[in-house]
Amino acid sequence: MNILTTGGAGFIGSHMAERLVTDGHHVVVVDNEATGRAENVPSGAHYVRGDVTDQACLEDIFSSGLDAVFHVAGQVSLIRSFTDPQVDLRTNIGGTVNVLQLCLKYRVPRLLYASSMTVYGSTDVLPTPEGTPCRPVSYYGITKYAAERYVHTTAERVDLDFEFRVTSFRMYNVYGPRQALDNPYQGVLGIFLGNLLRGEPITIFGDGTQSRDFIYIDDIVDAWVSALANRDAYGGVFNLGSGHRLSIRELADHVLTSFDRTREHGRLVYAPGRPGEQRHVEADVTLARKVLGWEPRVPFDQGLAETTRWATSVPSRPAA
């Protein structure tokens, strides 16, 4: 298949592109390198440095003929969605609409979309199934939910003259190799690892009892690939998480332990909470198990060990 991976130089997208190349697909990657890096693009993929907000750039790719799109690109910082909401809006909604319009124009039959657990907001329903009402509490969550609805509403249009099959994945806290270690606004586990590698204190925003559901990158890729040609996944929205949660304080302890440090020696500090943060998140992955035959396979301790080994092997970069 000819498959476009948007955001394919980034953390999640590059792992998607790598698996697709390994599976024998012809892969095109487009990325603006705002957070991605060209060296993440797998050998064998055709790389275009460009932006999903640039429809002319995308048109050159779509016009060559595509069988599927893995739409992973987006503005991914919850904090930046508050400080620069126009960029969040332009990238997450505008970029997605560009992709959708070109899918229709060039009759691309398959689209998989990277949604987010932030669409649920501060729900008391834990673990959270997909049918839970979406009440996002951050601008980022709003744009991800709006883009998700654009995806599915487009596929459900009665005036389409071809079958446009879409699937969305509400991904929880994804971690693993190639995660940003130098971006203070993206990925708490990567932030903590970067802090320790640079000899900085680990900063916990809030009291540390808030919890997150951490899912290893290989498990995420497995789910996407399993859905690609699965007719039962067409039109579906699936949670992708481990089904377990850790408090942020527990996460810090795990990261310190992975560096053979105690909390005291690791200089753990606290700061006021930030806007838009969900209190607790935990995925109900029953639907993904049933429809995709998918199961998260990588235990947290194993995934953290793999991520730590990778993090200690890459050149240190100053925090952004």
Model-derived features: where do they sit?
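A conserved pocket-lining segment of Rossmann-fold NAD(P)-dependent short-chain dehydrogenase/reductase
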Residues: S81, D161, V166, R170-A180, ...
